Amino acid sequence: DEEVAHINSNAVELIKREADKAKACLNFESGRLNNEVVVSRMGTRDFKVKIQGVAAHSGNDPEMGRSAIVQGANLVIELEKLNDIKRGKLINCGLIKGGISTNTIPDSCEIGILTRYKTREIGEEILKDIKEVLSKTFVEGTKTEFETKVGIGAMEKTDEVMGLFNLLSEVNEKLGYKKLVPIEVGGGSDAAFTSEIKIPTVCALGVVGEFNHTDKEYAVVDTMYERIELAANTVYELD
């Protein structure tokens, strides 16, 4: 259920309800080999763009055609210019299809876009910017429409999150385990849902392993006890 963002259940509602007024949230995504703990995850929003043009024979009546693909190609160039990797503003036009044959000026084009953002503010900025780009007409006689929806919200790095990480680190040191390292990553997790309701959250506290989502995936079983001990003692130390 989690891997498809709980589209078939009310898990998100349950997570937020149960976490309401909690002091902190520890999320048990798989741990990392070098003791990294996730303090920030990017949010996602996808867009499905459909462009309608006018078909025509590319040899006999080229002047009658209005290429949806040319309109789409220009949009892709403009959309990709919006990327600002350093700020955590990512736009990927990852899918494009259109036309029916090489001797027909294409009257259809579809573009699939996935965006990622470091903060909710940047997410709103992306939405505004993409709407502005998609309102442009590069090929007269074409029409551009789109649908959009939020995937997983951003798990934002805040002072409260780093306070929770520091507590984890102190407990970890007392237990004699290797030093924890805070990292920020692009992939999402359920940690976003508790972050959204302002609960200090850290992620990737599960059993340590590698190669997720592949046939090489494995877990270092001995670390399961270490992570249980770390989580239990951290909860005990919460104010």
Residue ranges and their predicted role:
Residues 30-39, 46-50, 54-239:
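Metal-dependent amide/peptide-bond hydrolase catalytic core
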